[in-house]
UniProtKB/Swiss-Prot annotation:
One of its GO terms (biological process) is lipid A biosynthetic process. It comes from Klebsiella pneumoniae subsp. pneumoniae (strain ATCC 700721 / MGH 78578). SUPFAM superfamilies: OMPA-like. The lineage of its organism: Bacteria, Pseudomonadati, Pseudomonadota, Gammaproteobacteria, Enterobacterales. It catalyses: a lipid A + a 1,2-diacyl-sn-glycero-3-phosphocholine = a hepta-acyl lipid A + a 2-acyl-sn-glycero-3-phosphocholine; a lipid IVA + a 1,2-diacyl-sn-glycero-3-phosphocholine = a lipid IVB + a 2-acyl-sn-glycero-3-phosphocholine; a lipid IIA + a 1,2-diacyl-sn-glycero-3-phosphocholine = a lipid IIB + a 2-acyl-sn-glycero-3-phosphocholine. It is an enzyme of class 2 (transferase). This is Lipid A acyltransferase PagP.
């Protein structure tokens, strides 16, 4: 019995030590991530290479996730515009700060602003062609939620040539809510 208790105690103590190290490691990872993010946002704001025009192009409600009666009523032409600043870092990745307003699914104005980052690849010998995958962190507000600010973390993907980029995201959701593909053109000046 004493032997089992000793083995259990040693195992529990080892678990506490490992979980303490994992917790410290997780905390330091979060801290490093926050510092990297805040430094990238500050550098993009203070040292922009480009001014960007955003032109919303399409919203598409995933038909498998909606009743037809709902999608028949939704607006899928998000008229609007936006403005931003951006830069390419030393690794060739894209960073941007943006503010955009567009007509949402109910044809009401929806503003969104935030920071976007994309890992960028240039797979062809023509370095003007680029592909990107990343994320955006921002805040939006919707009419059907009384324009209460709502934080968003969404994936980003893009395909572009030179200063013109077609950028997109997917808003996940539940049945008859969310599950929207949203895309826009971004022009760098």
């Amino acid at each position: 019995m004493l032997r089992r208790f000793s083995l259990f105690s040693l195992g529990f103590l080892g678990w506490l030590l490992v979980s303490g190290n994992a917790s410290a490691s997780f905390s330091s990872t979060l801290s490093e991530g926050y510092h990297t993010l805040s430094n990238n946002v500050a550098q993009t704001w203070n040292e922009p290479e480009h001014y960007d025009l955003y032109v919303p192009a399409i919203t598409w409600h995933a038909r498998f996730a909606y009743d037809k009666e709902k999608t028949d009523k939704y607006n899928e032409r998000p008229w609007g515009a936006g403005f931003g600043v951006s830069r390419w870092d030393e690794k060739g990745n894209w960073h941007g700060l943006y503010l955009m307003a567009f007509k949402d699914s109910f044809n009401k104005w929806e503003p969104i602003g935030g920071y976007g980052w994309e890992k960028t690849w240039r797979p062809l010998t023509d370095q003007n062609f680029h592909l990107g995958l990343g994320y955006t962190l921002g805040v939006t507000a919707r009419d059907n939620w009384n324009y209460i600010p709502i934080p968003v973390i969404l994936p980003l993907a893009s395909i572009g040539y030179g200063p013109a980029t077609f950028q997109m995201t997917y808003i996940p959701g539940t049945y008859n809510n969310g599950n929207v593909y949203f895309a826009w053109a971004r022009f760098q000046f």
